[in-house]
């Protein structure tokens, strides 16, 4: 699951302009049978998000919105049961869920007196039954269930995955008898930055080829693949901040990471794709 | 001066008499009349003798040590002439010694004249001498131009300068200003020259050990204070390019001067000093001249001079002991004379006896002289580190000239344990976040808190970037980080934020640079680093590895300028780049406070009669503790000096004349940033000089030119000079300072006296009240000074330049190999431990006195233990009160608040008002804290003391110790509690109130009571995320679009619902949002089942799900909704127009599943009939195709027509389990 930069690039190369559908995912799995599905999905999702971030603006010009909306209207007039919105999104290379939001906003602007608030839009996307127009509700719903990178369902899955891995990590810590403070406890104590876990007694992780081990004061669980982009963002917003306060620590990218990114070990940020097995705890007889 | 030396050489006076004469103003009674007469006539010159002697020796040796200036700094007065210049030896005139450059045409015939002149000049008041100082350029050119005359005037003793200028006729452009020595009256034109700049050393011999920028080794005579800049600013002048530039300029000019001379004189006495153009002969071709004791030219003369010189050193009449040693080592390791001596005519014995012939006529003479001097200083040598001793003992010249000395050195080496070890610091460690000082409660506002959060991160980001780049060529701190630092400082608006940041800055400073390469980690007052507890084994390996990777580092010659090595550079540059007045002020406050705190630390005093082995162990600890405190103090003081004098330093020349007077008047009004004078006085009185002086020296080393002229600081210098004089190494006796303590003080003071801003004449001017330095008769019998707190490790750590001695010897061994500045590495200290407890500041009154007295005769560990216990128990007591009394009050507050909320309804009123009400009720209870605290200390302290003291402690001592511990702990705890308990309760209650109010708010689902998984659960259920993802796939397949071959098997659906059940029953991984989505997805799935929209895999005939299968799946769903979901399930979605509309697409429409589902929902009590009726009713309002609307109406009727049989039962259910279905899913 730890990929070299070259391996990662090969996968990323295959993901250029691929729509975020389950069909695409299936093809990807066939193309890289040796990689875990979760890793592939995580990479796919990240790559797609990068792509969307790059192209986001061009879909949000008023001309673009107007043209999409007209195409949508024309489409549903012809056949309301056809996947008009989904096809439109795929055609213009935009995420279906985001396209659904775009059209929904435009629709509500037209049909309501006051411009729709963000929370109303979000609520309607979560539960399309609330959308006043039945055809649009179906179209939106179709976009959402067919989008594997954006949308409320995907967000929920990601959140659940993150939570599950934190629980997993907590269990492992308990199993190893390592006492810790979790995020909630830290927040209650007034910490300004809170990793998932701070070890109350640090441990040393031994590395097979290195003479010395690495001290670990804190552990952060990341249920995603560590690519350059996300890792640098995490370093800046989280990992270094933890280091600045608590000293060296460990990041677990459960879905793997690019090997080359694990370059701050000496500095005190260690990357792993699983819970380390070779841990040495403070031995009281020595101390 | 020369007269004195000559009468000495002629044996008219004895060495002892001369030394007495120098050291004291009056002749001792032991002097015989003849001597007294000979010397008293020269009385006025007394003070000038030592500078003269030092310069004389330097000049005499300049042919042997051709690189000249890098020679250890000369003392006041300028260089003397090279006797053996190629043009012909000096012709019998004394003036020869005053030549710097070879061609000596005009020589002084009367050495006394310049002296007299100088003396006259000196009589003026100190500050006056600053007048007439010259600008930098003048000063530089003065090297060979007229300006040099001025320099002489200003010098404190050497007669030699003037003739040096004369000795170089081509450069003698102004004869009026620079008449021959002796003829120049000390007129106002006697301007002060700049300090002489030493050419960069390029000699082949010294190339490795010579610092390239040995700027502090200029002759003392050049007045530093008259000299602007370059030298002064360069060490920290990153932001002050002018300084650097002028240094360059000076170098350049010197270079030109030299090359001019080279052209003029056939034989270069000094190799051209430029760095870039090596002489052809530089490498390799030189062969060392062997030294032979048999070929020493005039033993007696050399012996005499060596004796006088040694005596001056021993009496601390020279400013810098180690500089002289360095010089002697240079003589010892001199490789060859620059010019061939053979051509010199034989000198007659008469000539040899006087000063007219060169003192050192050959390498043999040099080595002989050096060995003579070293013999007198065996004691100092034997206290050098083991490495230096080894090199000395193995030096073949030493063996050859004095087998006895060599034998003693060898013995000293073999017995030495003074291994100075090299340790690298572990990589940077951040200051840890401590909730007690760093959390929100310590900030005035949320904004300040979050701003500081960001600042901490920016600070470390900057630090890391510096670590990564500062060694890269071309990287510039200001360019790279300056704007970011200033932007960050700009955000520090509140004063409180500044103090937070300064605390972080100071802690990080101590942590990273406490000692140059200190083991880091252990910061004062902080827990020792975990690494050091993990076993010395690993740590040792780690450090050895790092040591190997460590780059060689030169400390910059025997007398380097104050610098900021390593990480210190970061902090200096940070201060400069930040250029924030507020920051500097807060930093000074904080540094001053910490310095006072550490300086006042009650370090255990030496107990001379500790005979058992335990004391040895104790001493290890004491020494370490002392080292930590001392090194921390030095670091803090250095930065305090840097910041405090920063506004007054600049590249421009120091002011003179009236301007200077007005500046002095102004500056003398400014109170010192820290009352160092008082601290020094107290330190001397308490015999803690060994702690106070080293940090004071660091502080003063950053003083600007005006500082030494201020009365306040003059007093300090006077005290330091007296102290210096009193530290006679040979006087060792009971009650005197330990040898290594003295050595440390001599080294740091000697270094200070060489700092350019410290006027060198200060040293020689000082009237020596000298002898016994009895500051105070009531000094304690045993102070820190009498305790062996300094070891070689600490000595070398504080004074890395002492290591230059070793480099010099090593480069002798290794020949000229290696040009990188020496292979010797920087000396860094071993790891040190954290401090023990601090003394309680509360010792007042009789009890306190008694307690003090009690400790006086107990081992120091007892006191430390008691203080430690008191400190910890006191602190724990506060925490205990917090966890018990305060926590109880908070609980009360919470229940009171709940009552309020119930009575006042949802809103609960204004939170601030609520808080006030609660606090007014609860704060009075805080009064109990004192009683509880007292009780706690009483209960806990004795046990702790008992556990920590040795078992054989007498019962009475033990119980006294316990009582004192109880008292101190109680005092500490109660002082804190009485001052803070109300605020503490208030703060905690406030936090509780906001917590409660927040909990009132959103996420009722999350707060709802939830069942955990059963005890037997092994948490093997599928993960919620996996299930959502799977169901989502089914949904997307059902909604389409899909490929023709896509579909799901009925078994898969069944399995999926089974898994869903497992997941819902194992709550381990389930979080509320996931459950909500699962609930919603399950409802969607049910709607698709009802509408028969799920594509089934298999032959086309089977494309649709069998009724039976569909019912079975719906049953499973119903059971999940009923039994397993703990959150609300949005069942009404089953009857949303969109989901019912799915049926519209199927042909033929089948309504039976929907009807079945509705009935089951009612049956299971998941939805009420009325609710369903309402939903069905609203369905009619939607727009449907005609036939569909009809069928829907039929369904409604069918459902409504059913007997209300389960109704009463249902109502019961609803009561038990309030209608879940009606609750809208949050999402």
Curated annotation (Swiss-Prot), chain B:
Protein's name according to its UniProt entry = Codanin-1
Where are the annotated segments for Disordered? 63-294
- Which GO biological-process labels does this protein carry? chromatin organization; import into nucleus; protein localization
Phosphoserine modified-residue sites:
265, 285
- List compositional bias (Low complexity) regions by residue number: 155-167
Region annotation (Interaction with ASF1A/B) maps to 188-208
Positions bearing N-acetylalanine: 2
Pathological condition linked to this protein in its record: Anemia, congenital dyserythropoietic, 1A: An autosomal recessive blood disorder characterized by morphological abnormalities of erythroblasts, ineffective erythropoiesis, macrocytic anemia and secondary hemochromatosis. It is occasionally associated with bone abnormalities, especially of the hands and feet (acrodysostosis), nail hypoplasia, and scoliosis.
Sorted alphabetically, the Gene Ontology cellular component annotations on this record are:
cytoplasm; cytosol; endomembrane system; nucleus; plasma membrane
Record function comment: May act as a negative regulator of ASF1 in chromatin assembly.
* Bilayer topology term: Multi-pass membrane protein
Q: Name the InterPro entries on file.
A: Codanin-1, Codanin-1_C
Assembly information from the UniProt record: Found in a cytosolic complex with ASF1A, ASF1B, IPO4 and histones H3.1 and H4.
**Positions with biased composition (Polar residues):** 214-232
Composition bias of kind Basic and acidic residues appears in 128-137, 247-260
Q: Where are the transmembrane segments?
A: 312-332, 626-646
What tissue specificity is annotated for this entry? Ubiquitously expressed. Isoform 3 is not found in erythroid cells.
Keywords from the named record? Acetylation, Congenital dyserythropoietic anemia, Cytoplasm, Disease variant, Hereditary hemolytic anemia, Membrane, Nucleus, Phosphoprotein, Transmembrane, Transmembrane helix
* Cystine pairings recorded for this chain: none
- Modified positions (Phosphothreonine) are 71
Compartments, record wording: Cytoplasm; Nucleus; Membrane
């Amino acid at each position: 699951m730890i990929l070299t930069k070259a391996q990662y690039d090969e996968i990323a190369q295959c993901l250029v302009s691929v729509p975020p559908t389950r069909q695409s995912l299936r093809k990807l799995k066939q193309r890289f049978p040796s990689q875990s599905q979760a890793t592939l999905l995580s990479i796919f999702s990240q790559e797609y998000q990068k792509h969307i971030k790059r192209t986001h603006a061009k879909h949000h010009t008023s001309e673009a919105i107007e043209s999409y909306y007209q195409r949508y209207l024309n489409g549903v007039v012809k056949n309301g049961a056809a996947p008009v919105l989904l096809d439109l999104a795929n055609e213009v290379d935009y995420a279906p869920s985001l396209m659904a939001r775009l059209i929904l906003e435009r629709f509500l602007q037209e049909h309501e007196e006051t411009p729709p608030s963000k929370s109303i839009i979000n609520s309607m996307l979560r539960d399309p039954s609330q959308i006043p127009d039945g055809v649009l509700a179906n179209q939106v719903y179709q976009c959402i269930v067919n989008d594997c990178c954006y949308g409320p369902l995907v967000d929920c899955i990601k959140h659940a995955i993150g939570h599950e891995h934190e629980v997993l990590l907590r269990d492992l810590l308990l199993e190893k008898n390592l006492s810790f403070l979790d995020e909630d406890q830290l927040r209650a104590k007034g910490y300004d930055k809170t990793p998932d876990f701070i070890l109350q007694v640090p441990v040393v992780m031994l590395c097979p080829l290195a003479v010395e081990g690495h001290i670990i004061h804190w552990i952060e669980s990341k249920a995603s693949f560590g690519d350059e982009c996300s890792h640098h963002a995490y370093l800046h917003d989280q990992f270094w901040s933890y280091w600045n306060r608590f000293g060296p620590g460990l990041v677990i990218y459960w879905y793997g990471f690019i090997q080359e990114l694990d370059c701050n070990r000496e500095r005190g940020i260690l990357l792993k794709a699983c819970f380390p097995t070779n841990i040495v705890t403070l031995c009281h007889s020595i101390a | 001066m020369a007269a004195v030396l000559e009468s000495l050489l002629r044996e008219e006076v004895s060495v002892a008499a001369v030394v007495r004469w120098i050291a004291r103003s009056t002749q001792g009674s032991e002097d015989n009349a003849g001597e007294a007469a000979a010397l008293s006539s020269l009385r006025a010159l007394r003070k000038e003798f030592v500078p003269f002697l030092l310069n004389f020796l330097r000049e005499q040796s300049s042919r042997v040590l051709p690189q000249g200036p890098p020679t250890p700094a000369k003392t006041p007065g300028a260089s003397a002439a090279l006797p053996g210049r190629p043009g012909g030896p000096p012709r019998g005139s004394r003036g020869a010694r005053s030549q710097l450059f070879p061609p000596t045409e005009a020589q002084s015939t009367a050495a006394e004249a310049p002296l007299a002149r100088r003396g006259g000049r000196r009589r003026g008041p100190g500050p006056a001498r600053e007048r007439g100082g010259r600008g930098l350029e003048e000063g530089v050119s003065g090297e060979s131009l007229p300006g040099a005359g001025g320099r002489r005037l200003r010098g404190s003793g050497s007669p030699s300068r003037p003739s040096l200028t004369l000795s170089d006729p081509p450069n003698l452009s102004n004869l009026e200003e620079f008449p021959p020595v002796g003829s120049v009256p000390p007129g106002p034109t006697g301007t002060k020259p700049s300090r002489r700049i030493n050419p960069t050393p390029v000699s082949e011999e010294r190339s490795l050990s010579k610092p390239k920028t040995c700027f502090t080794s200029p002759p003392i005579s050049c007045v530093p204070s008259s000299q602007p800049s370059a030298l002064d600013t360069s060490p920290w002048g990153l932001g002050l390019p002018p300084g650097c530039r002028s240094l360059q300029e000076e170098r350049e000019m010197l270079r030109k001067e030299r090359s001019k001379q080279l052209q003029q004189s056939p034989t270069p006495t000094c190799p051209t000093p430029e760095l870039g153009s090596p002489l052809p002969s530089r490498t390799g071709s030189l062969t060392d001249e062997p030294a032979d004791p048999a070929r020493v030219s005039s033993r007696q003369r050399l012996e005499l001079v060596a004796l006088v010189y040694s005596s001056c050193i021993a009496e601390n009449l020279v400013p810098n002991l180690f500089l002289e040693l360095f010089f002697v080592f240079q003589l010892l390791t001199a490789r060859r004379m620059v010019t061939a001596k053979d051509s010199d005519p034989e000198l007659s014995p008469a000539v040899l006896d006087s000063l007219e012939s060169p003192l050192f006529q050959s390498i043999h003479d040099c080595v002989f002289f050096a060995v003579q001097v070293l013999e007198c200083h065996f004691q100092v040598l034997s206290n050098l580190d083991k490495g230096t001793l080894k090199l000395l003992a193995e030096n073949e010249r030493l063996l050859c000239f004095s087998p006895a000395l060599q034998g003693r050195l060898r013995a000293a080496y073999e017995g030495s344990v003074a291994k100075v070890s090299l340790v690298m610091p572990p990589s940077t460690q951040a200051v840890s976040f401590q909730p007690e000082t760093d959390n929100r409660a310590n900030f005035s506002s949320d904004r300040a808190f979050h701003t500081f959060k960001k600042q901490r991160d920016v600070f470390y980001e900057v630090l890391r970037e510096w670590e990564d780049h500062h060694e890269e060529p071309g990287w510039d701190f200001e360019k790279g980080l300056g704007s970011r630092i200033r932007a960050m400082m700009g955000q520090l608006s509140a004063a409180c934020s500044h103090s937070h940041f300064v605390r972080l800055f100071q802690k990080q400073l101590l942590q990273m640079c406490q000692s140059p390469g200190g083991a880091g980690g252990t910061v004062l007052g902080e827990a020792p680093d975990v690494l050091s507890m993990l076993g010395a084994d690993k740590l040792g390996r780690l450090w050895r590895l790092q040591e190997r990777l460590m780059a060689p580092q030169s400390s910059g010659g025997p007398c380097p300028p104050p610098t900021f090595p390593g990480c210190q550079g970061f902090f200096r540059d940070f201060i400069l780049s930040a250029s924030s007045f507020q920051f500097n002020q807060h930093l000074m406050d904080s540094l001053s406070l910490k310095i006072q705190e550490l300086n006042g630390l009650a370090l255990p005093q030496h107990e001379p009669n500790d005979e058992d082995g335990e004391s040895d162990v104790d001493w290890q600890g004491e020494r370490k503790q002392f080292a930590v405190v001392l090194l921390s103090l030095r670091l803090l003081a250095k930065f305090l000096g840097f910041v405090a004098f920063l506004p007054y330093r600049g590249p421009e020349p120091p002011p003179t004349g009236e301007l200077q007077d007005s500046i002095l008047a102004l500056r003398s009004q400014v109170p010192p940033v820290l009352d160092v004078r008082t601290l020094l006085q107290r330190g001397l009185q308490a015999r803690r000089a060994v702690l106070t002086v080293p940090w004071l020296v660091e502080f003063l080393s950053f003083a600007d030119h005006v500082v030494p002229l201020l009365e306040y600081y003059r007093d300090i210098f006077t005290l330091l000079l007296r102290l210096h004089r009193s530290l006679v190494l040979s006087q060792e006796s009971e009650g005197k300072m330990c040898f290594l303590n003295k050595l440390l003080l001599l080294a740091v003071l000697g270094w200070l006296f060489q700092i350019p801003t410290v006027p060198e004449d200060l040293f020689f001017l000082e009237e020596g009240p000298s002898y016994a330095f009895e500051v105070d008769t009531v000094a304690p019998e045993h102070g820190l000074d009498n305790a062996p707190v300094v070891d070689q490790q600490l000595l070398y750590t504080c004074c890395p330049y002492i290591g230059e001695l070793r480099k010099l010897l090593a480069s002798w061994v290794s020949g000229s190999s290696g040009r990188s500045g020496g292979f010797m590495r920087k000396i860094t200290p071993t790891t040190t431990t954290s401090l023990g407890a601090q003394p309680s500041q509360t010792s007042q009154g009789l009890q306190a006195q008694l307690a003090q007295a009690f400790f006086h005769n107990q081992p120091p560990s007892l006191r430390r233990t008691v203080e430690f216990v008191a400190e910890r128990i006191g602190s724990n007591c506060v925490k205990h009160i917090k966890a018990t009394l305060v926590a109880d009050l908070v609980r009360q507050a919470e229940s009171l608040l709940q009552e309020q909320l119930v009575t006042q309804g949802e809103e609960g009123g204004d939170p601030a008002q609520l808080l006030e009400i609660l606090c007014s009720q609860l704060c009075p209870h805080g009064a109990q804290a004192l009683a509880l605290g007292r009780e706690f200390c009483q209960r806990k302290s004795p046990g702790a003391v008992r556990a920590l003291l040795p078992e054989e402690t007498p019962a009475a001592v033990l119980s006294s110790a316990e009582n004192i511990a109880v008292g101190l702990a109680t005092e500490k705890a109660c002082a804190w509690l009485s001052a803070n308990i109300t605020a503490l309760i208030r703060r905690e209650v406030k936090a509780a109130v906001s917590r409660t109010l927040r909990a009132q708010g959103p996420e009722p689902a999350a707060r709802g009571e939830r069942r955990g998984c059963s005890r037997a659960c092994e948490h093997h259920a599928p993960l919620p995320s996996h299930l959502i993802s799977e169901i989502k796939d089914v949904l997307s397949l059902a909604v389409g679009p899909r490929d023709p071959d896509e579909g799901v098997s009925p078994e898969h659906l069944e399995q999926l619902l089974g898994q869903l059940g497992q997941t819902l029953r194992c709550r381990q991984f389930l979080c509320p949002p996931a459950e909500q989505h699962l609930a919603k997805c399950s409802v969607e799935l049910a709607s698709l089942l009802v509408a028969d929209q799920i594509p089934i895999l298999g032959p086309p005939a089977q494309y649709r799900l069998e009724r039976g299968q569909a019912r079975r799946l719906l049953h499973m769903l119903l059971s999940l909704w009923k039994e397993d979901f703990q959150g609300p399930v949005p069942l009404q979605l089953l009857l949303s127009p969109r989901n019912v509309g799915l049926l519209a697409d199927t042909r033929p429409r089948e309504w039976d599943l929907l009807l079945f589902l509705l009935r089951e929902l009612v049956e299971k009590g998941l939805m009420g009939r009325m609710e369903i009726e309402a939903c069905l009713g609203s369905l009619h309002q939607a727009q449907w195709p005609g036939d569909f609307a009809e069928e829907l109406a039929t369904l409604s009727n069918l459902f409504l027509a059913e007997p209300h049989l389960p109704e009463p039962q249902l109502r019961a259910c609803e009561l038990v389990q309030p209608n879940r279905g009606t609750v809208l899913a949050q999402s």
